[in-house]
């Protein structure tokens, strides 16, 4: 693999960025510096850490950055569920983003498992 851009998990995480940014347009202004800001950072962290990890020299480093991306995925997923609970998003409007979160999480877990055998 020559580029992180070829990784399907990175491509899916970029789709997630777009889906979350579209969802965030529904947040009230009072959440601009709270949930909005936290969710933007969390969703951007996912493809960023996948890319950074893929660019590192060793499998151990890649696993480290994939673990950070996985943590950001869990953080984002929790924040989306909070938004649903507070009535900011409907379950239906968040369905695409939550589905991508599940898919990305499974891919990251699989990559970590495969890379860990090389350590």
Language-model regions, residue ranges each:
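Short, C-terminally biased terminal segments at protein or domain edges
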Residues: 1-119
């Amino acid at each position: 693999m020559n580029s992180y851009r070829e990784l399907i998990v990175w491509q899916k995480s970029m789709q997630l960025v777009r889906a979350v940014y579209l969802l965030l347009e529904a947040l009230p202004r009072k959440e601009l510096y709270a949930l909005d800001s936290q969710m933007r950072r969390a969703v951007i962290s996912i493809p960023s850490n996948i890319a950074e990890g893929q660019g590192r020299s060793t499998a151990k480093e890649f696993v480290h950055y994939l673990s950070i991306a996985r943590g950001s995925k869990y953080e984002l997923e929790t924040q989306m569920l909070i938004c649903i609970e507070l009535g900011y998003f409907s379950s239906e409007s968040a369905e695409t983003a939550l589905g991508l979160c599940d898919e990305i999480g499974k891919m990251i877990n699989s990559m970590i498992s495969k890379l860990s055998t090389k350590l």
